[in-house]
Amino acid sequence: MVTDKQIAIVTGAASGIGRAMTLGLLDAGVDVAAVDRNETGLAAMAATVHDKMGTMQTIPADLSQQSSFDTIVSAVLSRFGKIDVLVNNAGIGQASIKPDQRRNPIRFWEITPDQWQRFLTVNATGPIMMARAVVPHMLRVGKGRVITVTTSLGTMVREGYLLYGASKAAAEAAMAVLAADLRGTGITSNVLVPGGVTNTAIVGDDAGDRARMLQPEIMVPPLLWLVSDAAAGITARRFVAMDWDASLPGAQAAEKAGVPIAWLGIARMPVEPAT
């Protein structure tokens, strides 16, 4: 459980996984700064949260713009005075380019330089720059949580998924570096993924029966554990939401659903030269 009033930033909060995580945090009593470029979507969500235990601040922002990061942090600090949790969720999928991209994959030679740059900017640079803006404020108090939504390993290397897969892989590798850089500071960096095709706008029109997909709310139980006191020492891990067993105590569920971040469990680290 959360034992004191926490302040969280959730990016990409107006729909899909971001919306589900925002509502889950609010239900748990966490105050949330909901960030999204979709101002209409933020307003619609804000109209539905009056009965929640937490309060919500809406911040319309485009994370492809470098000026957005400090603006977001300043707005949150002005409203709440601190930041305890950053949830990097904002992202774009290949269905934004080709709605039938599962049936007709986007081959790497078909992508444009502008498309490549946009996916890197939103899916990889955005989480890094958001953390860069937030973490100094966490360092001052010696605690904080950075939680980043990436994607399944299979998606990272899937045929026709260079734009999405590689940009999400870059984000996860970056979060592994964050975990290493932040070791001993009281600030953790972990990755959370659904574990399968999820009913969001990221997937295209040809993804199949949405009722049979994972639903965004699957992310809430592991997220709430990650922001709880019980997860204070947990860092450099990747948690798969579909493997989270909510019937188990949190630590056991985390052990079952977690693996080392960024494939560290399946690759041998290089031997460093002696110093």
Placement of each model-derived feature along the sequence:
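A short, exposed helix-loop element centered on a Lys and neighboring polar residues
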Residues: A131-R132, A176
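The beta1-alpha1 cofactor-binding region of Rossmann-like NAD(H)/NADP(H)-dependent oxidoreductases
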Residues: E39-T40, P60-T71, P113
